[in-house]
Amino acid sequence: MARRCTLTFKGSMIGNHVSHANNKNKRRLLPNLRSIKIQLDDGTTRRIKVAASTLRTMRKGA
């Protein structure tokens, strides 16, 4: 399964490890995903993966 937020579609990015000697090596920057249970309108619960920043926004709105 992809490392992607199911609500905002935030995914991984490509960056560099930079050493003190300014050597650069490729790395992946992964989103901070959390698995939460959410209740749908019909009463069923479903488990989804959400980024931590999205979870903060959801809690602020509630």
From Swiss-Prot:
InterPro entries xref list: Bacterial_rp_bL28, Ribosomal_bL28, Ribosomal_bL28/bL31-like_sf, Ribosomal_bL28_bact-type, Ribosomal_bL28_sf
Highest taxon of source: Bacteria
SUPFAM superfamilies, sorted: L28p-like
Molecular functions per Gene Ontology: structural constituent of ribosome
Cellular component GO terms held in the UniProt record: ribonucleoprotein complex; ribosome
GO biological process: translation
Swiss-Prot/TrEMBL keywords: Ribonucleoprotein, Ribosomal protein
One Pfam entry name: Ribosomal_L28
NCBIfam families reported for this sequence: L28
Similarity comment text for this entry: Belongs to the bacterial ribosomal protein bL28 family.
Name of the protein in question: Large ribosomal subunit protein bL28
Record organism: Helicobacter acinonychis (strain Sheeba)
Name of the coding gene: rpmB
